[in-house]
Amino acid sequence: MSQNKLKTLIEELKKRKVFNNITSEEKVDLITLDHGIYVGFDPTAISLHLGNYIQMVNLKRFQNVGFKTIAILGGATSMIGDPSFKDSERKLLSNETILENKKHIRKQLENFGFKVIDNLDFYKDMNILDYLRSVGKFFNVSTMMSRDSVANRIQSGLSFTEFSYQTLQAYDFKVLCEKENVMMQLGGSDQWGNLVSGLDFINKTLSKNLPTIGITMNLLVDSNGNKIGKSTGGASLWIDKTLTSPYVLYQYLLNTNDDDAYNLLLQLTFLQLSEIERIKNEHLKNPKLRLMQSRLSFEVVKDIHGKEEAQRALHISTSLFKEKNSWFNLSLEDLIQLKGSVDFVPFKDDLFLTLVDSKIISSKREFNEFVRDKSLKINGQDVTGLDYDLPWENYDNKYLILKKGKKQYWVIYK
């Protein structure tokens, strides 16, 4: 029964366009629900981002069918840096930075329901001689150099520190295999070489007869093959809502094209495949309604931040772009979420100076034209002239919402 569950899940992952490769189809039949699966997350930043999130979703799918799931927090491996398909060596992080990053990322992983283990615990009592004898002895340098993940870096320069990364990832797999009965490692398509190294290490040090397998998943990319996870301004889309507000994430997904929206519904949501096809068919009847994008945005924000934040993001979006004169429905908390999505500009001595200084308008003539055409609004009300009485009281005497034309927005603050 459990074998069928794994096979069925792999077939679903293929239909969801996330499955990339597996090291052994035959061993799938040997895996049971008593076996665990893990994914590693190196705390190289203060938060995980949307590109990491797809691996969290993939791991959650295994958990949902009954497998034990573990997220490895790379307290040790983040001190080195994975060279896989990187153009240059990462700058080494300080211990203080790694500790701070670990604290935040652990909470994100635990909130998603995973057991979190810090791999620093595997190495903190191991000295260099222990490592060379119990780990290094089992790795062939020529084989390590032939891995695609590092081969491209050999000519441009690869430090021994980075070169040894795959040995630590392999040792992680062995420890989890022994102590947690983990037989499966999940990783992005760029992790194939590291996964194979782990399997080879287990074969040499434990047994060749264990049902250990590595499964790689496609990276999060758009229909043009570009990595997804950056906002239009180039900043990462973080899982931490203090770095990327739920509304900004919502808007990013809402603005995807139809092909990307469909693929992301498959890859990032837990909706049934039949439901996704139903949404797609409804969408195609009237693409201007952007039903796929709307459902995608809501589902992802809900799964990351909770239903309340998803409803808030929907409310803000509806107030800004759909419902006429609904600015007054936005709360102060809603307004703060707009940071990162619309420009916040400082208030000068008066409204006209503020607009000129922020390059929103260029002259009094242009200002008067917008006023005449009723194309300048503050908090949903028409600006009537240079002496317009600004309604600061609407937002705690701190913010004004400016709209120019049909779709240009700013928040003025003081």
Curated annotation (Swiss-Prot):
ATP binds at K230. This is Tyrosine--tRNA ligase. Belongs to the class-I aminoacyl-tRNA synthetase family. TyrS type 1 subfamily. One of its GO terms (biological process) is tyrosyl-tRNA aminoacylation. It catalyses: tRNA(Tyr) + L-tyrosine + ATP = L-tyrosyl-tRNA(Tyr) + AMP + diphosphate + H(+). Catalyzes the attachment of tyrosine to tRNA(Tyr) in a two-step reaction: tyrosine is first activated by ATP to form Tyr-AMP and then transferred to the acceptor end of tRNA(Tyr). PANTHER family: TYROSINE--TRNA LIGASE, MITOCHONDRIAL, TYROSYL-TRNA SYNTHETASE. Homodimer. A motif ('HIGH' region) lies at residues 43-52. L-tyrosine binds at Y38, Y165, Q169.
